[in-house]
Curated annotation (Swiss-Prot):
Its EC number is 6.3.4.2. Catalyzes the ATP-dependent amination of UTP to CTP with either L-glutamine or ammonia as the source of nitrogen. Regulates intracellular CTP levels through interactions with the four ribonucleotide triphosphates. This is CTP synthase. Keywords: ATP-binding, Glutamine amidotransferase, Ligase, Magnesium, Metal-binding, Nucleotide-binding, Pyrimidine biosynthesis. NCBIfam families: PRK05380.1 (NF003792), PyrG (TIGR00337). The gene is pyrG. One of its GO terms (molecular function) is glutaminase activity. The keyword Metal-binding applies. Pathway: Pyrimidine metabolism; CTP biosynthesis via de novo pathway; CTP from UDP: step 2/2. InterPro entries: Class_I_gatase-like, CTP_synthase, CTP_synthase_N, GATASE, GATase1_CTP_Synthase, P-loop_NTPase. It is an enzyme of class 6 (ligase). ATP binds at S16, L17, G18, K19, G20, I21, D73. UTP binds at S15, K188, T189, K190, P191, T192, Q193, K224. CTP binds at S15, D148, M149, E150, K188, T189, K190, P191, T192, Q193, K224.
Length: 538
């Protein structure tokens, strides 16, 4: 931790300004200067983690290799940095409070009255310092907006850290909005000025202003922001909208963000090597080919519920010089006659609950019968089994016990027991608590030779991430296999991890979530081959 330098990223004016992408972009530039870099996300909500939140409330829950259910921004960090992060890279107010109360019960505070300062702020600082071990830079993204009461003690902890570490170890980057008033054709700086005033009132002074704007800022406006916010003129970085989030590091580099960073930290001029990155971004922005993927989901009112999967399709497309167009198909209102017109492949993602499953099953049947390339992920694979049992084996009552515990043919059922990542036996019932009780994180999968899965991964054993309570019932396996639906992947305890359909160009189901390990620089192999198959269809 001694050598680590800290870049704190806060947000002002309103939420969803792109602090996560901004943090990822800064980290990417520093990483490409051969520094050891990581990112930490602080979430101010009181939930322990987002695991039980509705996807429509929070967006995607991203699962790390060590089984943590985290904020979707952790997915951005991994995809930009091309490395695995852990549960140490995300914490919530719920976790902070829980730790402080647990310590109080153990008597670790020696009878003191427990207060926000110093006990809560000390726990925040401890976690930040712990995440910085072995690094040159730790970027810390503070969720929420300056002025929110939920974030007050985080800003206090940042203020204290700057005093403890010194100015030469800390930079505060404030992401803010420069709104454009169309009627007067003006860009307005007043919200930024007020946001910075509020931040400074709380004891945190920004050294860099990252101004989100729909239009470029002229020199006069940048100078105005610099003067009113008390930063150097070259420390006002304009972040206009880009055609791809992966173009943001290039934009920040062109805007000169590394100049104030190097100056503050007493570093020589920074020269990131971005040629390979630039090539991939160019293929995203101006690809040679196109495919259309029918994406059959039910959380379509907030597409960030599927963020990692959307990005994984983009990664595969970049490596194939292909624009992947998504045809969003609502599984609750699925029209089998018209919804799949013109699609080159069908994707059925993971999900929870009974709502919309019949539409997904209908789409899977179309993919099977019409030999459209198909990829089913988690619930998507489970429903492929249900569809096959109903329509090929004639088991009309086939279902998952997630939807009907008394179904006639429980071809998908609750994982009663399994070995977790620590080789501890876990036992689950239908009455088990929901939070943190799924099969979570990275597990090994043995692949059958001569399968599409082996062709994609090019090795007999892989590790992929999981997030599920239900599994395929092996009782019916022989019946499926006799009809051409083969099991091609096995996990611990012989859990069925992957299936493929014979005499079909590409019909694959996987229990794991391949999207969680896809990165711009290294797309996930099975998703890459899925897009290849769609390309051959188009």
């Amino acid at each position: 931790m001694d050598r680590a330098k800290f870049i704190f990223v806060t947000g002002g004016v309103l939420s969803s300004l792109g602090k996560g992408i901004s943090s990822s972009s800064i980290a990417t530039l520093l990483q490409h200067c051969n520094y050891q870099v990581s990112i930490l996300k602080i979430d101010p909500y009181i939930n322990i983690d987002p695991g039980t939140m509705s996807p429509l409330e929070h967006g995607e829950v991203f699962v790390t290799s060590d089984g943590a259910e985290t904020d979707l921004d952790i997915g951005h960090y991994e995809r930009f940095l091309n490395r695995n992060l852990t549960r140490l890279n995300n914490f919530t107010t719920g976790q902070i409070f829980s730790s402080v109360i647990e310590n109080e019960r153990k008597g670790e505070y020696l009878g003191k009255t427990i207060q926000i300062v110093p006990h809560v702020t000390d726990e925040i600082k401890r976690r930040i310092k712990s995440a910085a071990k072995g690094l040159d830079f730790l970027i810390v993204e503070v969720g929420g907006t300056v002025g929110d009461m939920e974030g007050m003690f985080y800003l206090e902890a940042i203020r204290q850290l700057k005093l403890e570490l010194g100015n030469e170890k800390v930079i505060n980057v404030h992401v803010t909005l420069i709104p454009y008033i169309q009627t007067t054709n003006e860009l307005k700086t007043k919200p930024t000025q007020h946001s910075v005033q509020e931040l400074r009132r709380l004891g945190v002074t920004p050294q860099i202003i990252l101004a989100r704007s729909p239009k470029p800022l002229d020199k006069e406006l940048k100078n105005k922001i610099a003067l009113s916010c008390d930063v150097e003129q070259d420390s006002v970085i304009v972040a206009t909208d880009t055609k791809s989030i992966y173009a943001c590091p290039i934009l920040f580099l062109q805007e000169g963000i590394l100049t104030p960073i190097a100056r503050r930290f007493n570093l020589n001029k920074l020269h990131p090597k971005m040629a390979a990155w630039n090539t991939l971004v160019e293929k995203i922005i101006a690809p040679k080919h196109k495919v259309k993927i029918g994406f059959v989901g039910k959380y379509l009112s907030l597409k960030e519920s599927y963020k990692s999967l959307i990005e994984a399709l983009i990664h595969a497309g970049a490596h194939l010089d292909t624009q992947v167009n998504i045809e969003w198909l609502d599984s609750e209102n699925f029209n089998e006659k018209t919804d799949l017109e013109g699609v080159d492949a069908i994707l059925v993602p993971g999900g929870f609950g009974e709502r919309g499953i019949e539409g997904k099953i209908c789409a899977i049947q179309r993919a099977r019968l019409e030999k459209l390339p198909f990829l089913g992920i988690c619930l998507g694979m489970q429903l492929a089994i249900v569809e096959f049992c109903r329509n090929v084996l004639g088991l009309k009552g086939a279902n998952s016990t997630e939807f009907n515990q008394r179904c006639e043919y429980p071809v998908v059922y609750l994982i009663g027991d399994f070995m977790d990542q620590n080789h501890q036996k876990q036992v689950r019932t239908y009455n088990s608590p929901l939070g943190g009780t799924m099969r979570l994180g990275e597990y090994e999968c043995e692949i059958m030779p001569n399968s599409l899965l082996e062709k994609a991964y090019k090795k007999p054993s892989i590790k992929e991430r999981h997030r599920h309570r239900y599994e395929i019932n092996p009782k019916y396996r022989q019946e499926w296999e006799n009809k051409g639906l083969k099991v091609v992947g096995f996990g611990s305890n012989h859990l069925i991890e992957a299936i493929e359909l014979e005499d079909h160009p590409f019909f694959v189901g996987v229990q794991f979530h391949p999207e969680f390990t896809s990165r711009l620089q290294s797309p996930n192999p099975i998703i890459l081959d899925f897009i290849k198959s769609a390309l051959s269809k188009s």
